[in-house]
A protein has these predicted regions:
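Extracytoplasmic/lumenal domain signature
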Residues: 1-207
Length: 207
């Protein structure tokens, strides 16, 4: 490899890359997901040198990839502690001071020991973020698993749709039909046997 960088572990975490910086999230370095805090790192894409880092403001490994939304000019990722994060980055790859925001997700139980964890990279379109969220028991049917829709203009949950299993991966979104009916369609799979393919039809303003 051209370079390597080690920090607490990178489990499932994919990177956002452009010519100026690489953004990647990390595990928290602690056992489980209710004690330590993961970080988001900004690295030089050519040398691997650390440009900047931010620690999450709540517990949990950070195991999603990082995505960028042009409309809000911000980057998004999720945590196993049950949060959606938003952060902004300067042109030099440093994080914009004071820009880190956190929205706690919901699985129907306000429990620190069974948080609404997410490893789902947010899929974003039209000011909406779509996220797969775990229930209180990862492999128990209908234990609070859901697809959560977040209104980014208010940085709040618009609504959620219950699922049989945990939608553990990212959704696949198409805007191909917006000119016809005004809706985006988002496809998610339950991580459950037998698996289910779910299609969510959504547009701004829906709750």
């Amino acid at each position: 490899p051209t370079w390597t960088y080690t920090h607490n572990g990178f489990y499932w975490a994919g990177a956002y890359v452009n010519s100026d910086f690489v953004l990647v999230t990390t595990d928290d370095g602690a056992e489980g997901y209710v004690t330590g805090r993961g970080s988001i790192l900004s690295l030089n894409p050519k040398t691997g040198k650390l440009i900047d880092s931010l620690q999450a403001t709540n517990v949990g490994d950070l195991r999603s990839s990082v995505c960028y939304d042009e409309e809000t000019e911000a980057y998004y990722f999720t945590s196993k502690g049950g949060d959606l994060y938003q952060v902004k980055v300067n042109a030099d790859g440093t994080f914009t001071k004071g820009s880190l925001r956190r929205l706690h997700l919901d699985n129907g139980a306000d429990s620190a020991s069974a948080p609404p964890m997410s490893t789902s990279t947010p899929v974003i379109a039209n000011g909406r973020a779509y996220i797969g969220v775990s229930g209180t028991s990862q492999f128990t049917a209908y234990s609070g698993h859901n697809i959560t829709v977040v209104d980014l203009s208010t940085f709040s949950i618009a609504y959620s749709v219950p699922t049989m299993g945990y939608p553990q991966t990212s959704g696949l979104l198409t805007t191909a039909y917006e000119d016809q009916d005004g809706y985006a369609y988002v496809y998610f799979f339950d991580n459950y046997t037998p698996g289910k393919l779910r299609v969510l039809r959504d547009k701004p303003g829906m709750t």
